[in-house]
Structures are given as structure tokens and as C-alpha cells.
């Protein structure tokens, strides 16, 4: 995990094996070049794990390969990709929670992820602890809180990306915030 690049390599095939390559300059390639860094950043902030974030980027663009051409408004590509990123991350979080509950997966050490974005050792420890607390939350609360407080999204954007009402997004964020404050004492 150490030092992995968040962007998929240039050799990543976005076309399934055996299918003809549509060639450079396709809508998918343009979307990938323009938005992969943003998708990767959002995926890492939500999931907190490099390996899962890398896989999620590939999943988002595989899904995009099937749907991008159907979008009527080219300006909507970014918003659509963000919504897909959030939805796929939500699914991964739900699966992860079940895997932990069933004993298939253990707890994760967030120290490395925390070190990459921290200014001080205290901040790193706090961030790693927040991710551990988030791991114990329902996916919808974790997702809404992460979008708001880790990604800095506006409440309206959180609601849109979580496919819920503004009131519901606020409630999920507040519930997560109370849990974090209860366990840490601040944040």
C-alpha cells in the first residue's frame, strides 16, 4: 500500500478483453482523463483505503463506459461521475461492514492513509481514529458525514449524491457527528 499512485496506470483497459478498442478520443477516455483524479480523491476520502479506492475508480469508469454516451448534457458528466462514485462507495461500505461482522475481514490500520494528509502526529492519530469510528457506522451516515466534513461538500450536494432529501442528509450527518464527538470528545 505504501506510496501507491491514486490514478490508474495508463495501461488500464477500460474496454473488456476481447472487445475492440474504440480508440483514443472517445467520450470515455475524455471523461477518464478529465475526472479520474477527482473520482480517485473522493473514493479515497470516503473509503479510507488505497486499494479499495483504486478498485472503485476502475468500477466507476467501467460503469461510465456503458452510460456516458446516454447523457444528454456533456456538462453533467462530472456530477454524474460523482454520484456514481458515491453510490459504488456506499455499496462497498455496506459489504465491508458485513464482512467485518461475519469475521471475514478484520479491522484496518488507517495510520498510512492518515499520515499522507496530516500536518502533525496528533492530527494523524485523530484522523486514523475518525476512520475507525466511521467503520463502525452505517454506510449512509458515514457517507454523508465524509462528503460533508472530509470532502467539504455543500449540504445540497451531499443530499443529491446520497439520493436523499436535504433533511435526511442533515440528520445522517448530525447522527455521525454525535457518535464521533461521543467517542473522541471533539471534531
Predicted regions and their residues:
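DNA-recognition helix of helix-turn-helix
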Residues: 86, 90, 156, 162-187
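Structural recognition of an alpha-helix C-terminal capping motif at a helix-to-coil junction
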Residues: 41, 55-62, 66, 75-87
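A short, charge-rich alpha-helical start-of-domain segment used by transcription regulators
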Residues: 8, 17-41, 51-54, 65, ...
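A short pre-motif secondary-structure segment
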Residues: 144-148
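Arg/Lys-rich amphipathic alpha helix in sigma70-family domain 2
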Residues: 69-72, 83-104, 123
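Sigma70-family region 2
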Residues: 20-22, 61-77, 95-97
